[in-house]
Curated annotation (Swiss-Prot):
Protein name per the record: Serine/threonine-protein phosphatase 2A 55 kDa regulatory subunit B beta isoform
One GO molecular-function entry: protein phosphatase regulator activity
Modified residues (Phosphoserine): S245
SMART domains: WD40
Organism for this UniProt entry: Oryctolagus cuniculus (Rabbit)
InterPro entries per the UniProt record, alphabetical: PP2A_PR55, PP2A_PR55_CS, WD40/YVTN_repeat-like_dom_sf, WD40_repeat_dom_sf, WD40_rpt
Assembly: PP2A consists of a common heterodimeric core enzyme, composed of a 36 kDa catalytic subunit (subunit C) and a 65 kDa constant regulatory subunit (PR65 or subunit A), that associates with a variety of regulatory subunits. Proteins that associate with the core dimer include three families of regulatory subunits B (the R2/B/PR55/B55, R3/B''/PR72/PR130/PR59 and R5/B'/B56 families), the 48 kDa variable regulatory subunit, viral proteins, and cell signaling molecules. Interacts with TOMM22. Interacts with IER5 (via N- and C-terminal regions).
Keyword Cytoplasm assigned: yes
Family: Belongs to the phosphatase 2A regulatory subunit B family.
Lineage: Eukaryota, Metazoa, Chordata, Craniata, Vertebrata
Keywords: Cytoplasm, Cytoskeleton, Membrane, Phosphoprotein, Repeat, WD repeat
Length: 413
């Protein structure tokens, strides 16, 4: 996740660590090196825990990271695992106080009887240190696994969503939250869908959307009522009966939902497609992009190896003109909304020497395979790109492929 200026890039891993990369200042003005990032700070955000009431282990794995807009010299970010959201402050220190009266240089207290002179403490320069400190811990509000966090445009509140509920928090208050959506039925046997993702509108602090495992998107307005179980708008595409199959419901489940920067459009990702919806048109998306339609014939084996339940994310570029999402075999896809052109690129160690140009990849479905094409049957489904990020104003992208992070910039002639 890039911060709002794009100077920092935060990543979370399965071990509960957050690693922040900072853009190399010297390389910014050098055209061919402008996308260089180096490690800025690493800290342990979450530890493994155990829920003794339910006899369940709580993984430390980071599910989501969201930056807050910068208000002063320090940076603030939210990170969450399955149960607990934390607010972190990341700040720099290049001076330290020296010359305390009651403490010696090691920090031990001195006997007041030995103090004969009064000193004024002074600040001395020291090597730059980046400190990460937890400022707030928002816990005990989610029975189910948290899948989304989203910072509101009022910068005072944020929401966290799990499978059945969405809670609204104030950054200053850790011991209570407002439940704004609750889709849990009185009888759990009647449960037909779960919440898969949620996000606030980028400009209107009262509006948010959430998506479901049934492929629907609900837009809610908090001005209408305190509990937003009744939506303001309901986006759903009618199903084509000719495409109906055993897997229809599974592959229509939405894994990610994102507002465009302008706030006019919503992008959703299901298993095979990315769809763009206009907020003013609820009955069908205005654009549908096939991410990997060649997998339609492979759904049976993808179901058997559980890949069909993978949750791919999607991102907009800074001007909302290009969208990006991941696929298998370390492939990721980009779709240009204006020219309707699309490209498949690969993030792998074999073909990405520093500053090497990525070649478009093609997947062939049957018949004769050209030399530069890859056959559907030889795709590696264990190598998947679920998480991607796009710099807010430049063509610099970050792609997470298993335990590698790749940063690419657009080619300059």
């Amino acid at each position: 996740e890039f911060n709002h200026t794009g100077e920092l890039l935060a990543t979370g891993d399965k071990g509960g660590r957050v690693v922040i990369f900072q853009r190399e200042q010297e390389s910014k003005n050098q055209v061919h090196r402008r996308g260089e990032y180096n490690v800025y700070s690493t800290f342990q955000s979450h530890e493994p825990e155990f829920d003794y009431l339910k006899s369940l282990e709580i993984e430390e794995k980071i599910n989501k990271i969201r930056w807050l807009p910068q208000q002063n010299a320090a940076y603030f970010l939210l990170s969450t695992n399955d149960k607990t959201v934390k607010l972190w402050k990341v700040s720099e220190r290049d001076k330290r106080p020296e010359g305390y009266n009651l403490k010696d240089e090691e920090g031990r207290l001195r006997d007041p009887a030995t103090i004969t002179t009064l000193r004024v403490p002074v600040l001395r320069p020291m090597d730059l240190m980046v400190e990460a400190t937890p400022r707030r811990v928002f816990a005990n509000a989610h029975t189910y696994h948290i899948n989304s966090i989203s910072v509101n445009s009022d910068y005072e509140t944020y929401m966290s969503a799990d499978d059945l509920r969405i809670n609204l928090w104030n950054f200053e208050i850790t011991n209570q939250s407002f439940n704004i959506v609750d889709i849990k039925p009185a009888n759990m046997e009647e449960l037909t869908e779960v919440i898969t993702a949620a996000e606030f509108h980028p400009h209107h602090c009262n509006t948010f959307v959430y998506s479901s495992s049934k492929g629907t998107i609900r837009l809610c307005d908090m001005r209408a009522s305190a509990l937003c179980d009744r939506h303001t708008k309901f986006f759903e595409e009618p199903e084509d009966p000719s495409n109906r199959s055993f897997f229809s419901e599974i592959i229509s489940s939405i894994s990610d939902v994102k507002f465009s920067h302008s706030g006019r459009y919503i992008m959703t990702r299901d298993y095979l497609t990315v769809k763009v919806w206009d907020l003013n048109m609820e009955n069908r998306p205005i654009e549908t992009y096939q991410v990997h339609d060649y997998l339609r014939s492979k759904l049976c084996s993808l179901y058997e190896n559980d890949c069909i339940f993978d949750k791919f994310e999607c991102v907009w570029n800074g001007s909302d003109s290009v969208i990006m999402t991941g696929s298998y075999n370390n492939f990721f896809r980009m779709f240009d909304r204006n020219t309707k052109r699309d490209v498949t690129l690969e993030a792998s160690r074999e073909n990405s020497k520093p500053r090497a140009i990525l070649k478009p990849r093609k997947v062939c479905v049957g018949g004769k395979r050209r030399k530069d094409e890859i056959s559907v049957d030889s795709l590696d489904f264990s190598k998947k790109i679920l998480h991607t990020a796009w710099h807010p104003s430049e063509n610099i992208i970050a792609v997470a492929a298993t335990n590698n992070l790749y940063i690419f910039q657009d080619k300059v002639n």
